[in-house]
Amino acid sequence: AKLINYMGNTPETNQGGKLISVNGKTNGEGGGTPDTPSKPDTPATGEGLTIDGTTVTLSNAAATTTGTSVELNLNTLGLANQAAVETVKFSDGSTVTFDANGQENGPKFYTNTKGVRVYANNKLIFKGIKKIKQIVMTCDSYNGINYVGNATATIEFSDKTATYTNLYTESTGGGVQLRVKTIKIIYAE
């Protein structure tokens, strides 16, 4: 059977296809039970990731001091509606790059939500002018849904760089979009 990646996040087989191997086992050997990841009880999850209402906070445990900060409102940059967003610059020279990370749906700016929609497995790569202690993002809420990204998202800090991935590992769907409106970088000093 041919495996097709439908809509960038749903693996399917072609119609009439037959599955001939499960977990590396074939014809009667039995594939056993695949490992299933545990689901978090609360939306606040992952090391360095906290979700509270429409606020997503990314914290660097290795940064113990607090310095200056810079804030960016994505709605004030003159970005084109429904257009892909790549790199935007903060007033102090720090940047955030919105990366599709190989996914069919990449980050786009929408005027009606006043921010950038970040889809499943997309990345945000922050490059600070100094070591980053924390990143605070305010996000959109619509019809009772807080668009704060997936609870399984990851954050990785490395000196002046931080990489957020809106990780989604389920076989169907795309999880929760991150609809980021403002971003505040707090530096360590």
Spans of model-derived segments:
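Short beta-strands within extracellular/lumenal beta-sheet-rich domains
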Residues: G106-I129, A151, R179
